[in-house]
Amino acid sequence: PDYILTVETKGIPLAVMVARAFNKPLVIARRDSKVTEGSAISINYVTGSSGRIQTMTLTKRAIPQNAKVLIIDDFMKAGGTAKGLTELVHEMNGKVVGTGVLVATAEPNPKLINDYESLFTFHGIDESTNEIHIEPVFDTIDR
């Protein structure tokens, strides 16, 4: 990838580490635009988890045309944020080369986006025992 993209705020620490690993610049989409950042592209997207309409904004100079972009986020329920980020990259005339998330929920399935990788799958919380049911997606990691 040429750029690593995430949305503020919770995905930033993970995206910082990915950007450092790839030695690529990190771009952060905002939920609102800042006048000091210059002209921007904004899109409205529907969150997959709550079905609410939210806004996502990226300055026009953040990602050049034809840039290859890797999307990183911390958590995916239905995939609405990842889909919104994908649409934002397309509006910037960039190409999404992959989407990675730390944790994705098992349900709903399918998600609003098809092509993503997650490290863990969240199956739920057993309220009677307060146990969190989460499992790694990969059984082994090549070293």
Regions picked out by a protein language model, each given a short descriptive name:
Residues 1-8:
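Short glycine-rich phosphate-binding loop at a beta-alpha junction
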Residues 2, 67, 97:
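Conserved acidic residues
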Residues 13-22, 86:
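Short Gly/Thr/Asp-enriched flexible loops that form oxyanion-binding sites at enzyme active sites
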Residues 22-24, 93-94:
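A short helix->loop->beta-strand "cap" motif at the edges of active sites that frequently abuts
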Residues 23-69, 136:
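Short, glycine/charge-rich flexible loops or terminal/linker lids adjacent to PRPP-binding catalytic cores
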Residues 74, 79:
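Conserved G/P- and acidic residue-centered "switch" motifs that form tight phosphate/ATP-binding loops
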Residues 86-143:
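PRPP-dependent phosphoribosyltransferase catalytic core
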